[in-house]
Swiss-Prot record:
InterPro entries: Flu_NS2. Coiled coil: none annotated. One of its GO terms (cellular component) is virion component. One of its GO terms (biological process) is exit of virus from host cell nucleus through nuclear pore. It comes from the Viruses. Mediates the nuclear export of encapsidated genomic RNAs (ribonucleoproteins, RNPs). Acts as an adapter between viral RNPs complexes and the nuclear export machinery of the cell. Possesses no intrinsic RNA-binding activity, but includes a C-terminal M1-binding domain. This domain is believed to allow recognition of RNPs bound to the protein M1. This is Nuclear export protein. Its main location: virion. Keywords: Host nucleus, Host-virus interaction, Transport, Virion. The gene is NS. Belongs to the influenza viruses NEP family. Interacts with protein M1. May interact with host nucleoporin RAB/HRB and exportin XPO1/CRM1. A motif (Nuclear export signal) lies at residues 12-21, 85-94. It is found in: Virion; Host nucleus.
């Protein structure tokens, strides 16, 4: 995994956790949780690709990994829409920068997961 991506995840999660968005803080916590989950999933998929012989093990361990992959893409699309919405509604420049970087990171992670999954197929 690219060390820049790791630091990007950590930076964005840290900054999102410091935001105070009033009544929507529960929604923001949900987004943070999904970001963390997405990072873990991407990391595990990347590790499986690094050990190409692990494909058989991955398929045995999780017979529904393609279904899970589809759900992750839905989750990414939902997060992208949520981040876009927040970006449009906030006037705070710190939040705008954070959400713009989060959006860029989501696009990068989506591409990485697609690349990993094609290598596993």
């Amino acid at each position: 995994m690219d060390s820049n991506t790791v630091s990007s995840f950590q930076d964005i999660l840290l900054r999102m956790s410091k935001m105070q968005l009033g009544s929507s803080s529960e929604d923001l916590n949900g987004m943070i949780t999904q970001f963390e989950s997405l990072k873990l999933y991407r990391d595990s998929l990347g590790e499986a690709v690094m050990r190409m012989g692990d494909l058989h093990s991955l398929q045995n361990r999780n017979g529904k990994w393609r279904e899970q992959l589809g759900l992750k893409f839905e989750e990414i699309r939902w997060l992208i829409e949520e981040v876009r919405h927040r970006l449009k509604t906030t006037e705070n420049s710190f939040e705008q920068i954070t959400f713009m970087q989060a959006l860029q990171l989501l696009f990068e992670v989506e591409q990485e997961i697609r690349t990993f999954s094609f290598q596993l197929i």
